[in-house]
């Protein structure tokens, strides 16, 4: 979740509680093990709902449910095309965190706990040997008329140009998919993650104004991802129209297909190093 204008918090880490769960799963397609590994990061999970919205018919839609559904659908598409896919979670939970990550009553993550969970996602992406990282989220804003798709990247990394290329592919492919199906979703474009002015977490200094899952490392404090990546805010759940759209399984599949198409195009057109 990011603020529609400045985004003053890390996506998916607005101090909400989380629950422990299963470890990350990496599943290979045995027929084509030579293809690159893709890491998908569905935001939130367990009792951490992320943001939430209400459809035109009064149905509640949670970010954690939508990110998981879209991520699993994306993984299915990619695996069918021969890619190996790893995910940061595979059900409505989060992999286990130490007790110290939680508040005294165990119902919330501390700021350090949030950072620990984000570091877990980064470490799992690195351990998977992935060639690309996509973090999936949905947005919210106080004005319910605000909507659209936006994708973030980090320009300061050594592979910043590839981050930009990937974010551009994600954004353009998603917007095109929505528009082709008659959904007039606003194109909020791509943005460098420093434009979010994201709040620092745990032991990170206040000057660290990057999204943790995309940004550079800090010696002794943060280990960064080792591959190009982007974070996409698919729609605004605070907009009843967009909450209604994404509540439909067919639209979840549409978004998953767009993500998969962008990922495959990124990997198959990647410049030689």
Briefly describe each language-model feature range.
Residues 35-60:
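Short glycine-rich His-centered loop
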Residues 2-20, 25-29, 61-273:
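Active-site-proximal helix/loop segments of hydrolytic enzymes
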């Amino acid at each position: 979740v990011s603020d529609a204008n400045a985004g003053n918090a890390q996506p998916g880490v607005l101090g909400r509680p989380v629950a422990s769960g299963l470890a990350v799963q990496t599943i290979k397609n045995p027929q084509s093990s030579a293809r690159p590994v893709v890491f998908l990061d569905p935001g939130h999970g367990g009792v951490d709902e992320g943001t939430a919205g209400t459809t035109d018919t009064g149905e509640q839609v949670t970010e954690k449910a939508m990110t998981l559904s879209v991520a699993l659908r994306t993984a299915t598409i990619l695996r069918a095309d021969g890619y190996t896919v790893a995910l940061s979670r595979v059900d409505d939970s989060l992999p286990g965190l130490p007790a110290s990550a939680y508040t005294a009553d165990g119902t919330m993550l501390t700021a350090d706990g949030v950072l620990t969970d984000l570091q877990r996602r980064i470490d799992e992406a690195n351990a998977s040997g992935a060639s690309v990282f996509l973090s999936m989220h949905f947005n919210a804003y106080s004005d319910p008329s605000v909507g659209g798709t936006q994708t973030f990247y980090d320009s300061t990394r050594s592979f910043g140009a590839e981050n930009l290329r990937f974010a551009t592919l994600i954004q353009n492919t998603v917007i095109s998919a929505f528009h082709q199906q008659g959904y007039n979703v606003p194109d909020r474009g791509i943005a460098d993650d420093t434009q979010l002015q994201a709040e620092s977490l745990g032991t990170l200094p206040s000057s660290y104004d990057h999204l943790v899952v995309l940004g550079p490392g800090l010696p002794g404090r943060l280990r960064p991802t080792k591959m190009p990546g982007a974070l996409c805010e698919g729609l605004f759940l605070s907009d009843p129209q967009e909450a209604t759209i994404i509540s439909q399984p067919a639209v979840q599949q549409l978004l998953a297909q767009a993500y998969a198409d962008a990922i495959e195009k990124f990997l198959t057109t990647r410049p030689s190093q």
